[in-house]
């Protein structure tokens, strides 16, 4: 499955125009600064500038630490929110999934009405969304029963929250594309599992898994093979009525399906259902 997605934008651009003003206000008014702070009294604005410079230079670890300090010292301000999102974004770039998710979840809990809420949900979805693997990266090399799809489901829920809460967000169109991709990939995974069972002679399990895929994911490309698997499995089980019913649905909905009249290749034998 090949799908092109937009690259992740820099954090919460809608906050950017407000952040510098907040930083200046903190500098003039004094945002919760401890005189014994390891930053030696550096202004919030200066710290933020340094953090951005470090991030631009690729020194993500140093930038993350600075954003952590800003988050604490500017607590309750838009600058603190921006620092959280910048921090989460850099952790995401460094593939530190657990830490990145923790920061985003903290942001959403502390700032449920933030103007950058849509970006937070979008980033949360991206963290769980593994585009490179695409659910099929090393599928043939791995026992299907060992693969966990929870991260994919979590990503879907984050994107759904974004689309439902912020339908006009600039991130919504890409989130919708990713949601569709996830649904198709999850359905294909379920069919892969059904095929896995079938090829190992677990025909009842194969039929049940294929049927579940059809119930959970309607109108997906993998539905064709799911119907074929049901018919093939019922044929192996000697359940002619159920086999014929699955065959009828397949032919009715996909009259030109390549699965009609074919079977799976097996080292021991070839077989054809129709």
Give short role names for the model-derived ranges.
Residues 10-12:
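Intrinsically disordered, low-complexity terminal tails
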Residues 2-7, 27-274:
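Acidic, polar-rich low-complexity tracts and alpha-helical solenoid repeat scaffolds
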